[in-house]
UniProtKB/Swiss-Prot annotation:
Protein family per UniProt: Belongs to the UPF0677 family.
One annotated GO biological process: methylation
Protein name per UniProt: Putative S-adenosyl-L-methionine-dependent methyltransferase Mkms_1061
Functional description taken from the UniProt entry: Exhibits S-adenosyl-L-methionine-dependent methyltransferase activity.
InterPro entries: Ppm1/Ppm2/Tcmp, SAM-dependent_MTases_sf, SAM_mthyl_Trfase_ML2640-like
Source domain of life: Bacteria
Binding site for S-adenosyl-L-methionine: D133, D162, L163
Length: 308
């Protein structure tokens, strides 16, 4: 079903299912030899969602080789996807660690999905971690982790609100202090926002961020109309491959393509000092193999860090 202005979802459908997909990839990456991440909550959270395809991946019942027996390395290759998510996860983990070392004690995770950083990272004493996502997503994850006996490693504040609504008011009502430096992440989010919504969100974060604040984002590539069809063909290839295993989701209906601002430049114009790294370089930095076919791993995605 195509996106609408007021669409909602759970973790088994629409955009929510992509959060479960990413958590399954983190579970795969956690089991890997010489793993670069350790997310002990990824597998149980995926199992709790109950999508059979992702549960089988997360538990190891279905392997990346099962999905790609001919080792074609195509767009649906789970080894490549898991490596990409491992590198991405490590990037944002390290970002929060660096922010903590710099003395930042407020962290904000936008569209947190099945992110478990509030439970698995070694936050300094006094750190407050705010998680923002749709109410159903927040409630499901909080309840599931409570049943697992998981305890937050920071002061944990959930903010059950859609980013299209008054999320700033909800965040401040939860105790966020805009006069204190903060560390923000937008991981795997911008592709699900129209270009103008991406700009608006960056402007809002800038407004809430005094000097000393930090931001890390996964920057989506601006795609001219000529590239849209190629992107959709890649997504259709993934859909066709995974449909054989009982999971059918049209990814092309979930994302927004087209021209959009380049994140580092946009932030630089608004007073942030930025740095960035490509997905390919990030994989290599993590000791993971980069894809020869850049279309498979969206190698031109850039991970941006910014300091106010």
């Amino acid at each position: 079903m195509a996106r609408t202005d007021n669409d909602t979802w759970d973790l088994a459908s629409s955009v929510g299912a992509t959060a479960t997909m990413v958590a399954a990839a983190r579970a795969v990456a956690t089991r890997a030899p010489d793993a670069v991440i350790d997310d002990p909550f990824a597998e149980p959270l995926v199992r709790a969602v109950g999508v059979d395809f992702f549960t089988r991946l997360a538990t190891g019942d279905l392997t990346p080789t099962d999905l790609d027996p001919d080792a074609t390395g195509g767009a649906g290759n789970m080894d490549r996807f898991a490596d990409g998510m491992a590198a991405r996860t490590r990037f944002f983990d390290d970002f929060f660690s660096d922010a903590a070392d710099a003395g930042v004690r407020q962290a904000v995770i936008l569209a947190s999905g099945l992110d478990s950083r509030a439970y698995r990272l070694p936050w300094p004493a006094g750190t407050v971690v705010f998680e923002i996502d749709q109410p159903g997503v927040i409630t499901f994850k909080s309840d599931t982790l409570a049943r697992l006996g998981a305890k937050p490693t920071a002061v944990h504040r959930t903010v059950p609100v859609d980013l299209r609504d008054d999320w700033i008011g909800a965040l401040e009502a939860a105790g966020f202090d805009r006069t204190e430096p903060s560390a923000w992440i937008a991981e795997g989010l911008f592709g699900y926002l129209p270009p103008e919504a991406q700009d608006r969100l960056l402007d809002q974060i800038t407004e809430l961020s005094p000097p000393g604040s930090r931001l890390a984002v996964e920057g989506v590539v601006s795609s001219p109309d000529a590239d849209d069809e190629q992107i959709r063909e890649r997504m259709q290839a993934v859909r066709d491959q995974w449909r054989q295993f009982g999971f059918d989701l049209d990814f092309s209906e979930l994302v927004y393509t087209g021209e959009r601002a380049e994140v580092a430049a946009y932030l630089g114009d608004r007073g942030w000092r930025t740095d960035s790294i490509t997905a390919t370089a990030l994989l290599e930095k993590c000791g993971l193999q980069s894809a020869e076919d850049s279309s498979a791993n969206f190698a031109d995605v850039r991970y941006v860090t910014a300091v106010k």
